[in-house]
Amino acid sequence: MSPREMTGHTCPLRGAAPARAPLRRASGRRARVLVVDHPGSARSVLAAVLRGAGYHVALVASGPAALAELERQGADVLLTDLYMPEMSGWDLTRLVRARGIASTRGRPLCVGLSSAVLSGVSRAQLARAQVDFAITKPGDPEAILETVERALAWAEVA
């Protein structure tokens, strides 16, 4: 798969990664996913899908809360809604990158969540914002898990 090729509900932007990654880090600790989205059914479904697959999931409702959580606990993957009122996912991603907020894997991998992310947002916009992967929501559970696994796999080979 080419680095800029869109397939299904996922949009890899940083190059090909192994198709599957283990749910546990080398240390044996479950991978931690920080989900940033306003409360609602999409957030609940996303959390249930990730927890059902064995991930440790933390939920926050805003960009500022996400920054505080990343500084306090870190994360292996950051899944953020791109369109939030207080601080957009675009702005959150830029701040995370600019501040160099490190996770247990070196830096959080951002996933933009939006119902129109693949049809209304260009790959160039995602790349400029340094978003690693994009999925539509609510999205297919298998596509969501595949995206998170690719993000973790990319972190292992980057």
What does each model-identified segment do?
Residues 59, 86-87:
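Residue-level signal for the "D+5" position in two-component response regulator receiver
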Residues 59-77:
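Acidic, metal-coordinating helix/loop segments flanking the phosphotransfer/catalytic sites
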Residues 103-120, 131:
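A short, hydrophobic beta-strand element within the central beta-sheet of small alpha/beta folds
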Residues 81, 85:
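Active-site residues of response regulator receiver
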Residues 136-138:
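A Lys-centered signature of the CheY-like receiver
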Residues 40-58, 129:
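Two-component/phosphorelay signaling modules centered on CheY-like receiver
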Residues 1-34, 38, 44-47, 106, ...:
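Non-catalytic signal-transmission and effector/linker regions of two-component phosphorelay proteins
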